[in-house]
Each structure stands twice: as C-alpha cells, then as structure tokens.
C-alpha cells in the first residue's frame, strides 16, 4: 500500500510539473512561430495601417511618405522611409528615417536628416477582435543639429479593435523621454478606419488552421476612409499639462497586389497652433 501511494504521489508530482512548465513553454513557442503575412483577421476583417499610429498587427511593409505643413509663412516638408519587419508571428521591429527641409516665404532656410528611430515590438494579445502590442522606441542622435541630434526612449503599447461591420480602431499610447532636454511627454493617438469593397479570392490561399481566407495580398481593391486624432502632453517643464492635438482626414486604397496608396489632410485641433494646415501622402509596399 505504501509503495502504491508513493508511486501515485510521484505521478501526481510529475503531472503537476509538466502542467506548470507547459504554459510558459507554449507561450515561448508562440513567440517563435514563423511569420505569416496576413492582411485579414480570423473573422475576415481587414488590417489597415493608420497614418500616424503604429499598428498592433505585425507585418513586413515598406512605407514611403511625404508630409507638408504650413503656418505663419513657414513651410515644412518631411519625407520619411519606414520599414516594418516581423521576425516571427509575434516579434518584430520598426525602423524610421526622416528627411526634413524648410522654407520661409519661398526661400529655403534649412534641411537635413532627422534622427533614426528603432522600435522593437512584441505582439502580446491576439484575438479575433482585439490585438495589443508592446514596444520600446529608441531614438538615436543620428540627425542634423537643426532637425535632430537627440536621444530618447518611448515605451508604449499599440492596440487594434474590430468594431464590427468593417469598422476598426487603431490606438496607441507611449511615454517619451528625451535625455538631452530632460523632458517627458505622454504621446497618444486614435485612428478610426472604415473599409469598403470585396476581398478578392484570386490572391488568397485557404488557411486550414482557421478555415478562413486570410493570406497575403487579399486587400487589393479595398478602399478605406480614415479619421485620426494624435497628440502629446508634456509631463514636466513649463508646458506641463498642455494638450496638443492634430486631426487627419484621409483615404487609402489597395492599388495593386502588394501596393497601397494613401493621402490625407492635416489640421490643428488645439491652440497655440504649430501649423495652419498640412497634407500627407505616400505608398505602402507589402512583402
């Protein structure tokens, strides 16, 4: 009887140990699961990139954007190249490189590269209607003295919500600290997207794991309307507590397999204004 009890206890202990280890091992295996280029959720809702908010979903995409802002006789142009690269299904990185030039009353007053930003990120929650990604933006002082030369970090989160009927919401929240100026601010944004069109099955492959057509460039031909609000609030210094907001109304379109085009109108929502109006446009290449 004693031997039987001992054997039973050993088996129970082994079972408990396996159970305790299985959860973290399963989580680790999920992070190392191979990347799968998906543009639709498990229930068929399109994943759409907002203009000024990092996505919660992972991908392999190249963005080439140009933004123009004007106010008080000063015009600022910013061209930016951004690469989003997923290493696995849940781990990835974003790299951003801007180039800025200004003119006043039509006369060039300065130009140069902005700072390089590197953003390691991990998809932490992934459900049919909600995604949450944690990230750590690191800004390196690689830009010109006029438009860069700062070191900063910005830990934050990005979220994606499926609101139903092809309405989606991209949102983000981060705390950015600039070391050179010893300044800290809360950075935030929300982007509402309404998608129109029909998913083409010409470029889809069935994912048997979920029984949905979700593969690669299934969003070619879809049209999207964007409404966005982004902003920042200083957490220290003379401007502590001020709210600085800007809005965007834009559209994007799946021009071809692996290529989206987009454009938007920018406007300030709070005073004092940093600019009077602005325009942005660009291309998204999906790999």
Task: Name each model feature, range by range.
Residues 28-287:
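Transmembrane beta-barrel domains of Gram-negative outer membranes and organellar outer membranes
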Residues 1-35, 207-212:
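Cleavable N-terminal export/targeting peptides
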